[in-house]
Regions:
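Serine hydrolase/lipase
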Residues: 75, 150-155, 159-164, 180-268
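Solvent-exposed, charged interface segments at domain starts and junctions
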Residues: 1-8, 71-73, 163-167
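Glycine-rich nucleophile elbow surrounding the catalytic serine of serine-hydrolase chemistry
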Residues: 166-179
Length: 268
């Protein structure tokens, strides 16, 4: 049974959509009043960019913390947005293709900065979601989560905080990975037209699974040898460790959405 909180399913979905424009106090109040006919409990909005998180990786997320000591309210809604990009940036690179090629050949390790500047999410779609070869945005998501927890705890409320998570598209991939690498932190998770988790990202980011795989196969998870292990060989390990999370997550999918119909090679 889904955990009931201050926000219902419709408001959570609307806030996830509005996150792309940057959530404001006015937006949260507007949606709440339209749904419930009254002002929401006191709340604070925490933005990842205000904490200087995601400046290099392109990660962008928001948390809304509702709190009222008298009513025993202490709820946190973490929201992860999906892919954003500026295709004109690629056009500019095309016009300077020779200069771009020289920069890349001199510093191939700086591919994201050279080719994907301003399009970090598209880099993440390829190298994190598809290949599982980069975890920069996932790590920044974890940093953001830790900062949010710290800010919530600083209020010293007597009621234990309850954490919810909503995520769309690319954010769905990261949100699910955040959920399974955060123990029992998140009580209820909604994902909308999500990109699936990547098997190799989970192995690399989940401490217990990482150790199990490294011990069983005699490899280091961060090395390229991990790709010698077929995803099908890893599924049973992941199922055993992560099966309990299934009851916490709800998938909202539009069957006409392109992402929903894609079959990714390393998906979990």
């Amino acid at each position: 049974m889904k955990q009931k909180g201050v926000l219902g399913e419709l408001v959570r979905a609307r806030l996830t959509s509005a996150e792309y424009d940057g959530l404001t106090k006015e937006t949260v109040e507007k949606f709440y009043i339209e749904e419930y006919g009254q002002l929401p409990p006191p709340f604070e909005i925490i933005h990842s960019d205000k904490l200087q998180i995601g400046e290099e990786s392109g990660f962008n997320g928001t948390a809304v913390h509702f709190f009222d000591e008298n009513q025993g309210i202490n709820e946190v809604y973490v929201i992860n947005r999906g892919t954003e990009g500026d295709l004109s940036k690629f056009a500019e690179l095309g016009e300077k293709w020779l200069e771009t090629l020289k920069k890349y050949k001199q510093n191939p390790e700086n591919l994201r900065e050279i080719v994907f500047s301003g399009n970090e999410d598209i880099y993440t779609d390829a190298y994190e979601v598809l290949l599982g070869d980069d975890q920069s945005q996932i790590r920044d998501n974890q940093k953001f989560k830790n900062e949010v927890i710290q800010k919530v705890n600083e209020k010293n409320l007597s009621t234990k905080p309850v954490f919810f998570l909503d995520a769309h598209s690319l954010g769905g991939n990261q949100g699910q990975t955040l959920m399974v690498t955060s123990g029992d932190l998140f009580t209820d998770v909604n994902v909308y037209n999500d990109a699936p988790m990547n098997v190799y990202n989970i192995v690399r980011m989940h401490d217990k699974i990482r150790k199990t795989v490294e011990d069983k196969y005699g490899i280091l998870a961060d090395e390229h040898d991990i790709y010698k292990i077929k995803p099908s060989e890893l599924y049973s390990i992941l199922d055993t460790e992560l099966g309990s999370y299934a009851s916490k997550i709800t998938y909202y999918r539009n069957e006409e959405d392109l992402l929903t119909n894609l079959t990714l090679p390393y998906a979990y």
